[in-house]
């Protein structure tokens, strides 16, 4: 745990060094002032008892000044804590996102990776780094307070020091046990929390709400949500009951210790071992010691809990990343050569892609077709390096895709997927965000809008219209959003573009119309279209037919019809959708 504590403090110092230094200064000042104030009270009361009013007033002013100084230091301390929480939370959230971007796409198919990500996000959202640093500072501050007040108590009476120590030890034991229990509970509940959040967000997703109402399944989803919530709440309530009972017992023992200290102090006074000022100061010191020791032991016992939550963040940050290539991508390749590749998803025992070999020439237009589950999307992810082959190789010219430096490679690749993003931004941003350095290339944006048959948006004024209903912008039809997604892919100056069923939600005729526009625009690019419909297949140079993870046929439209194989069967089933 020591390495974890140093690592977390190092990150806090890296992000907010000035605030951290101010916290240390304020913490030390507060801690020392407690002991100084206790001693001053003893001196002040003795002067009052001896009726030395002039000196008493001076000491009273000093005591008041110490109280004010302590409060100012406390306010500055927590102001710095708020600043640290804000800066550290934002910076670590960004670094968490950057780490997620460096993981391979296939790693997100692993449930454990997703659970780690959820716990890491919770660590940031709930301010666990601030909790940990606060616990560390509390421990250091209370050590100074405990040491200084214990020194004063021991000067008054060693017995008072011993009683004060024994009265606060139960806090440490309870906090240590309950802290570990609470972390294990939250770790156990992480999967349930993901499920609960998913069900909850269904009611806020306007794409889902319509279906919930039409099918009348709101009550069913609500029941599942309440069931998940109630199970988690019951587990949490059971823990809280144990926690409350344990701390109530600790409070009782602490109060018993304080009463015992009063009795001991009175006996010492009666035996002339304490004077009046020392009596009051010893009781004040005992109370301060109990409070400081209590918070010290609570913070110390809570430290493993806080550290465990922070460890969740580093558990995700420390996930091994794929070794990235360093080879510069040569966009002048003559063809893409796929040699005997196979691939399976994590935690499965079947091949999603099985022993596929094929060639794709540069600037060739390709349609990959097949029924759902045939492996089309998986093949495209392998061709674009989003997944790595487990067997075989993919060559761009003579270069192996696994050796490419990713940033350089992806500058030359555009992908428009079925679950394309609807950016709640301006029309200009929706298109040019794929190559944002050319955001102000108005002529290119307008030309793409015309080519995608969206002339109503091609004026300069329309480019700055906010789209989407989230921020009171203009809502578009699904067809318009899909055309913008394709335009976004085309705006990027890439040598290869892939459409992975982005028009699947459209009717076959509209889909074919949009894809014909796409092929016309992309005639000087390597264009790959993935679809389970065959309407566009007449327009492409080559058709790849897939079934059960294998390529079963390759050829053009007429060649494959003549074979009367898998493509022929698909064509016969779908030909009624298209106008000949």
What are these regions (language model features)?
Residues 95-127, 189-224, 315-326, 346, ...:
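Short intracellular "coupling" helices and adjacent cytoplasmic loop segments at the cytosolic face
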Residues 330-580:
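ABC-type nucleotide-binding domain
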Residues 1-33, 54, 58, 77, ...:
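Membrane-integrated ABC transporters
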Residues 20-76, 150-182, 272-276, 283, ...:
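Transmembrane helix-loop-helix hairpins at lipid-water interfaces of multipass membrane proteins
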């Amino acid at each position: 745990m020591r390495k974890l504590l140093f690592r977390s403090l190092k990150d806090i110092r890296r992000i907010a060094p000035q605030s951290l230094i101010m916290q240390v200064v304020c913490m030390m000042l507060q801690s020392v002032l407690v002991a100084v104030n206790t001693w001053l009270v003893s001196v002040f009361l003795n002067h009052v008892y001896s009726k030395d009013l002039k000196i008493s007033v001076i000491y009273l002013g000093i005591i008041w000044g110490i109280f004010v100084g302590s409060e100012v230091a406390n306010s500055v301390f927590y102001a710095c804590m708020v600043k640290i929480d804000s800066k550290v939370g934002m910076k670590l959230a960004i670094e968490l996102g950057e780490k997620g971007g460096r993981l391979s796409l296939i790693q997100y198919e692993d449930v454990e990776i997703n659970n780690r990500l959820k716990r890491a996000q919770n660590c940031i959202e709930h301010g666990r780094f601030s909790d940990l640093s606060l616990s560390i500072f509390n421990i250091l501050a209370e050590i100074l307070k405990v040491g200084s007040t214990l020194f004063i108590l021991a000067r008054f009476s060693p017995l008072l020091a011993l009683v004060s120590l024994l009265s606060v030890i139960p806090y440490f034991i309870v906090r240590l046990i309950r802290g570990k229990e609470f972390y294990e509970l939250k770790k156990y509940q992480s999967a349930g929390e993901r499920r609960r959040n998913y069900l909850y967000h269904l009611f806020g997703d306007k794409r889902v709400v319509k279906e919930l109402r039409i099918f009348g399944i709101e009550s069913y989803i609500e029941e599942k949500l309440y069931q998940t919530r109630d199970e988690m709440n019951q587990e949490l309530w059971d823990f809280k009951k144990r926690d409350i009972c344990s701390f109530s017992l600790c409070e009782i023992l602490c109060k018993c210790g304080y009463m015992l200290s009063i009795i001991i102090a009175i006996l010492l006074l009666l035996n002339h071992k304490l004077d009046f000022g020392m009596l009051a100061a010893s009781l004040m010191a005992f109370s301060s010691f109990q409070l400081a020791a209590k918070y010290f032991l609570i913070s110390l016992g809570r430290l493993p809990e806080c550290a465990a939550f922070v460890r969740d963040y580093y558990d995700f940050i420390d996930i091994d990343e794929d070794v990235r290539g360093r080879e510069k991508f040569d966009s002048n390749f003559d063809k893409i050569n796929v040699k005997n590749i196979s691939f399976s998803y994590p935690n499965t025992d079947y091949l999603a892609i099985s022993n596929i070999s094929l060639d794709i020439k540069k600037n060739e237009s390709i349609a990959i077709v097949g029924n759902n589950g045939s492996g089309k999307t998986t093949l495209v992810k392998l061709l674009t390096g989003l997944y790595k082959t487990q067997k075989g190789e993919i060559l761009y010219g003579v270069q192996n895709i696994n050796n490419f430096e990713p940033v350089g490679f992806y500058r030359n690749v555009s992908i428009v997927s079925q679950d394309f993003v609807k950016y709640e931004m301006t029309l200009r941003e929706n298109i040019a965000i794929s190559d944002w350095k050319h955001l102000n290339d108005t002529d290119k944006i307008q030309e793409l809008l015309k080519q995608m048959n969206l002339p109503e948006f091609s004026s300069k004024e329309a480019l700055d219209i906010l789209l989407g209903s989230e921020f009171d912008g203009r809502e578009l039809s699904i067809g318009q959003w899909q055309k913008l997604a394709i335009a976004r892919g085309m705006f990027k100056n890439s040598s290869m573009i892939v459409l992975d069923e982005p028009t699947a939600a459209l009717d076959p005729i509209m889909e074919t119309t949009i894809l014909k526009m796409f092929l016309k625009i992309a005639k000087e690019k390597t264009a790959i279209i993935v679809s389970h419909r065959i309407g566009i297949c007449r327009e492409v140079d080559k058709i790849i037919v897939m079934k059960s993870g294998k390529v079963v046929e390759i050829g053009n439209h007429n060649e494959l019809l003549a074979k009367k194989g898998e493509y022929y069967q698909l064509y016969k089933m779908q030909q009624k959708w298209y106008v000949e």
